[in-house]
Amino acid sequence: MNPLTQFNKILILPLLIALSLIVVAPARATPSCGMLPPVTLALGHYPSGLLNLMCNEFDSYGWNLKMMVKGDSDVYVIQNTFPAGAHSGWHTHPGPSLITVTSGTLTVYDAADPTCTPKIYRAGDSFTDIGCGDVHLVRNEGSETAVNIVVQIIPKGAPRRIDMPAPGNCPLITCP
């Protein structure tokens, strides 16, 4: 057998496997279900270095701030509306999010939690999402519409949200 032909066969098999994974992986992703389209309330663009912030003037109160961002960033302010039963689908973000529930109750499932214990947030509660590959799902398990406001810091031009497959350690959450 020609060594070049054998070499091409060796290269083609991994290429075909990789291509099949690229085609199949999105089919396993879990898009949102029942949510209203997100509303962008504001979008700001920050050049590299502008989000390098430090404040330790209030250390006497037990508070200081350090934030260092390398590269240009987009900062979004988003409103998400979850009718009863709606969920975000499993997803991640390329950067951190600061979330405040403004009405209703939301339940958050975190894939990194081995027991996938749900965390419940009510109107007035705030929580963070580190993003950067942290896979989670937000669901309205109540009977009234829930709304949250999210501030996201992400690399300039990156998608705000990346759909992910459902993790094996969490309950199966389907679209009602």
Give each language-model segment a name:
Residues 70-94:
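Short, surface-exposed binding/anchoring microloops in extracellular/periplasmic proteins
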Residues 122, 131-159:
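Ligand-binding loop in jelly-roll beta-barrel domains
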Residues 26-74, 117-120, 165-176:
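A short, N-terminal "cap"/entry segment at the start of jelly-roll beta-barrel domains
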Residues 12-22:
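Bacterial N-terminal signal peptides
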Residues 93-113:
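Glycine- and acidic-residue-biased ligand/ion/polar-headgroup-sensing regions
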Residues 2-13:
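Bacterial N-terminal signal peptides that target proteins for export
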Residues 87-89, 107, 125-139:
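Histidine-centered metal-chelating micro-motifs
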